[in-house]
Curated annotation (Swiss-Prot):
InterPro entries: EF-hand-dom_pair (IPR011992), EF_Hand_1_Ca_BS (IPR018247), EF_hand_dom (IPR002048), S100/CaBP7/8-like_CS (IPR001751), S100_Ca-bd_sub (IPR013787). Ca(2+) 2 binds at D62, D64, D66, Q68, E73. GO terms for cellular component: cytoplasm; cytoskeleton; extracellular exosome; plasma membrane. The hinge domain contributes significantly to its chemotactic properties. GO terms for molecular function: calcium ion binding; calcium-dependent protein binding; RAGE receptor binding. Homodimer. Homooligomer (tetramer or hexamer) in the presence of calcium, zinc and copper ions. Interacts with AGER and both calcium and zinc are essential for the interaction. Interacts with CACYBP in a calcium-dependent manner. SUPFAM superfamilies: EF-hand. S100A12 is a calcium-, zinc- and copper-binding protein which plays a prominent role in the regulation of inflammatory processes and immune response. Its pro-inflammatory activity involves recruitment of leukocytes, promotion of cytokine and chemokine production, and regulation of leukocyte adhesion and migration. Acts as an alarmin or a danger associated molecular pattern (DAMP) molecule and stimulates innate immune cells via binding to receptor for advanced glycation endproducts (AGER). SMART domains: EFh (SM00054), S_100 (SM01394). Zn(2+) binds at H16, D26, H86, H90. This is Protein S100-A12. It is found in: Secreted; Cytoplasm; Cytoplasm, Cytoskeleton; Cell membrane. Residues 16-48, 49-84 form the EF-hand domain.
Length: 92
C-alpha cells in the first residue's frame, strides 16, 4: 500500500471509529462529530469545545438535512481543512 493509500484508509478508519457509537453505524450524529472534532482535529479547527462552533459545522455539513453526517458530507469538512492547511503551508 502506498503512503497516500495508507492515509486514505486511515481517514476511513477514523470516521468509522466515531460513527459506530450511536445511531446508524455509517453516519455521525452531532455528538459523534463533536467527539471526532475535539479529539482528532483539536489543533486544526479553532473553538472545537464551543458548542456553537460544533452546531455551525454540523449544520453546514448536513447537506441533506437528515441530522446525520455521512462519509461524503464528512469529506467536505476534510477538504476544507486540507485547503486551509495547504494555504497556510505556502504562507510560511
Amino acid at each position: 500500500m502506498t503512503k497516500l493509500e495508507d492515509h486514505l484508509e486511515g481517514i476511513i478508519n477514523i470516521f468509522h471509529q466515531y460513527s459506530v457509537r450511536t445511531g446508524h453505524y455509517d453516519t455521525l450524529s452531532k455528538c459523534e462529530l463533536k467527539k471526532l472534532i475535539t479529539t482528532e482535529l483539536v489543533n486544526t479547527i479553532k473553538n472545537t469545545k464551543d458548542q456553537a462552533t460544533v452546531d455551525r459545522i454540523f449544520r453546514d455539513l448536513d447537506e441533506d438535512g437528515d441530522h446525520q453526517v455521512d462519509f461524503k458530507e464528512f469529506l467536505s469538512l476534510l477538504a476544507s481543512v486540507l485547503v486551509t492547511a495547504h494555504e497556510n503551508i505556502h504562507k510560511e
